UniProtKB/Swiss-Prot annotation:
Pfam families: F-box (PF00646), Tub (PF01167)
Tissue: Ubiquitous.
Gene name linked to the record: TULP11
Entry protein name: Tubby-like F-box protein 11
Source species: Oryza sativa subsp. japonica (Rice)
Sequence ranges assigned to domain F-box in this UniProt record: 53-108
Family note: Belongs to the TUB family.
Length: 406
């Protein structure tokens, strides 16, 4: 069998598996033929075992080359699901695929769930969109499959609005059907103050090496490569968002600042790097079923986590790009390059603020932009150094009512 035939056969086998697990947008679920849902008979099951054992016993060098070719050829969704399916065959395949697949910063691709916690691409923004469901108070984040604003997209994250007595929370999950802190798909949350002017983004897992976890009087340091397998989901503040008073009310643009507690300002300088999570804690995959979640007293990051970041410099601060008044249209305008089509007070673009620019260099690159394109549809384009999770949480803050600002 030629090497090309080996690659084609691997892609065919993996493609058949991955197509059964591909998710689509709620309300547009693709119907699967009844025959595909029927359990296989004994003969087909035996044949499947034989094929799987054949592939798992390939020499490591040949297997790595085959998987590298598959990863290179399946560059974008929905074909990218074949790469994910390769990682699910067995432990050896998973290890090789994880070594081959690069981070979004380097590749511009979102492949695994951990990619949503990693910085976006440097060269071009990651183009996503958010769908709002007013009835259920839920929000769904998708990555666009094409440049069109009307494609189905690939589901990434979901959020559900929860009103509390003194605040509002948005729970963020990898599962669109079960958005709860009690599931292993919970990745973090956004919490507002009573007035809706200040928000805090909490990560469910340590955002970078050296986080201090505290509960009561005890504390311990957890490195990125030594995460305890029995750490339940906690509250690790990674960003603080504030909205300032708008004297023009709903007619004028909002003023917002985002202090990225887990990203140093050096990340946007020449040769700078941003902290990157490489994997979820072991508990995320295997131990959550046996670990009780803390409800009122969750595990929290100690205030000293901020000092761990600021030892090598201050944190990155983002601000909204000031719009210009258009005399002919009689409205405030920003150049969204065709990605926003409906005027809204929610629309914004974030750039590095002056206080994050000690060298007085111009940082006009838009790191995150968000805008309305339909009644319940919004675009979200983000890039390095923030992640999809952070960008989604920041955009969720724009949906919340601002009592003191409007």
């Amino acid at each position: 069998m030629s090497f090309r035939s080996v690659i084609q056969e691997v892609k065919g086998e993996i493609g058949a598996i991955s197509r059964r697990g591909f998710r689509s947008r709620p309300g547009r679920v693709r119907r699967v033929a009844a025959a595909a849902e029927e359990p296989p008979d004994e003969s087909s099951a035996a044949a499947l075992v034989m094929r799987e054992s054949c592939w798992t016993q390939l020499p490591p060098e040949l297997l790595r080359e085959v998987l590298a070719r598959v990863e290179e050829s399946e560059g974008w969704w929905p074909r990218r699901r074949d790469v994910v399916a390769c990682a699910g065959v067995c432990r050896s395949w998973r290890g090789i695929v994880r070594e081959i697949v690069r981070t979004p910063e380097a590749s511009g691709n979102l492949t695994f769930p951990i990619s949503l916690k990693q910085p976006g691409p440097r060269d071009a923004p990651m183009k996503c969109f958010i769908v709002r469901n007013r009835t259920t108070q839920t929000y769904y984040l998708y990555i666009g499959l094409t440049d069109a604003l009307t494609d189905d997209g690939k589901f990434l994250l979901a959020a559900r609005k929860c009103r509390r007595t003194t605040c509002t929370e948005y729970l963020i999950s990898l599962d669109m059907n079960d958005i709860s802190k009690r599931t292993d798909s919970y990745v973090g949350k956004l919490r507002s103050n009573f007035l809706g002017t200040k928000f805090t983004i909490y990560d469910a897992h340590p955002p970078y090496a050296g986080d201090v976890i505290s509960k009561g009087q005890s504390a311990r340091v957890i490195g990125s490569n030594h995460l305890s397998p029995r750490i339940p989901a906690g509250n690790y503040p990674v960003s603080h968002i504030s909205y300032e008073l708008n004297v023009l009310g709903s007619r004028g643009p909002r003023r917002m600042h985002c202090a990225m507690d887990s990203i140093p300002v050096s990340a946007i300088e020449q040769g700078g790097t941003a902290p990157t999570q490489t994997e979820f804690p072991l508990s995320y995959h295997e131990s959550f079923t046996s670990i009780p979640f803390f409800k009122s007293k969750s595990v929290r990051a100690n205030n000293s986590t901020a000092s761990l970041l600021t030892q090598n410099g201050s944190k990155l601060v983002l601000k909204n790009k000031s719009p210009r008044w258009h005399e002919h249209l009689q409205c405030w305008c920003l150049n969204f390059h065709g990605r926003v089509t409906v005027a809204s007070v929610k629309n914004f673009q974030l750039v590095a603020s002056d206080e994050s620019n000690p060298t007085n260099q111009e940082h006009d690159d838009v790191i995150l932009q968000f805008g309305k394109v339909g009644k319940d549809m919004f675009t979200m384009d983000y890039r390095y150094p923030i992640s999809a999770f952070q960008a989604f949480a920041i955009c969720l803050s724009s949906f919340d009512t601002k009592i003191a600002c409007e």
